[in-house]
Amino acid sequence: MILFPAIDLKNGQCVRLEQGDMARATVFNLDPAAQAKSFADQGFEYLHVVDLDGAFAGKPMNAQAVEAMLKIVKMPVQLGGGIRDLKTVEAWLGKGITRVIIGTAAVRDPELVKMAAKAFPGRVAVGLDARDGKVAVEGWAETSEVTALDIAKRFEDAGVAAIIFTDIARDGLLKGLNLDATIALGDAISIPVIASGGLASIEDVKAMLTPRARKLEGAIAGRALYDGRLDPAEALALIRAISG
């Protein structure tokens, strides 16, 4: 299991939102690169970054902050937000991003995902953010009529590296992961699934390490790390002890 620390970027700063609402943003660090280094120093091995402004604009908006992080940390970085065409995918991978996350475009333009996954094997993930079971797009500003499972199944044979499944209702609220829905998705498809939204404490990490969650690739931790509710050393030691 991989525990991904999250850095969400808004106006070049490291923030956390509540339920994806840009008006409910809390700034946690003015220097995202310093935050990335802190996570690396704490022992994390894979960083999760989202360009929030990019998700709304439909194009990269925090490139300077992302590039500054890439210069400082050597661990793999997966990036989402504003990645809507093959040119942007290629540009980010060329700059050192390990894995890009395609969200809105996976709903609007599934062929883009298939082309990108074929062109860059193992380096394209799909972000599915659900509200009441239906996938939200455009930075969560709009809700579609399709379910996460419907979309995930489109990419079963496309070579997608992972599905990142976020429960919007829990995101940033420390209510605990929606493991039931995440595990159900993971059990229904062959693509590895990453849990996101609501991770609140070491209890969520323990739940991720139980046999029923064995198919999940990992979980994303955000506010719990920034608020000090989740101790990085304790969480990483537990993961190493149980999953190796």
UniProtKB/Swiss-Prot annotation:
Protein EC: 5.3.1.16
Q: Does the keyword Isomerase apply?
A: yes
A single Gene Ontology MF term assigned here is:
1-(5-phosphoribosyl)-5-[(5-phosphoribosylamino)methylideneamino]imidazole-4-carboxamide isomerase activity
Q: Which GO terms describe its biological process?
A: L-histidine biosynthetic process; L-tryptophan biosynthetic process
> Where in the cell is the protein located?
Cytoplasm
Q: Which domain of life is it from?
A: Bacteria
Q: List the GO terms this entry assigns under cellular component, sorted alphabetically.
A: cytoplasm
Active-site residue list: 8, 129
**What keywords tag this UniProt record?**
Amino-acid biosynthesis, Cytoplasm, Histidine biosynthesis, Isomerase
Pfam families from the entry? His_biosynth (PF00977)
Pathway involvement of the protein, from the record: Amino-acid biosynthesis; L-histidine biosynthesis; L-histidine from 5-phospho-alpha-D-ribose 1-diphosphate: step 4/9
Broadest EC class? Answer: isomerase
Catalytic activity, per the record?
1-(5-phospho-beta-D-ribosyl)-5-[(5-phospho-beta-D-ribosylamino)methylideneamino]imidazole-4-carboxamide = 5-[(5-phospho-1-deoxy-D-ribulos-1-ylimino)methylamino]-1-(5-phospho-beta-D-ribosyl)imidazole-4-carboxamide
Report the coiled-coil segments: none
Which family is this sequence assigned to? Belongs to the HisA/HisF family.
* HAMAP family associated with the record: HisA (MF_01014)
- Report the protein name in the record: 1-(5-phosphoribosyl)-5-[(5-phosphoribosylamino)methylideneamino] imidazole-4-carboxamide isomerase
- The scientific name of the source species is Bradyrhizobium sp. (strain ORS 278)
Q: Which gene encodes it?
A: hisA
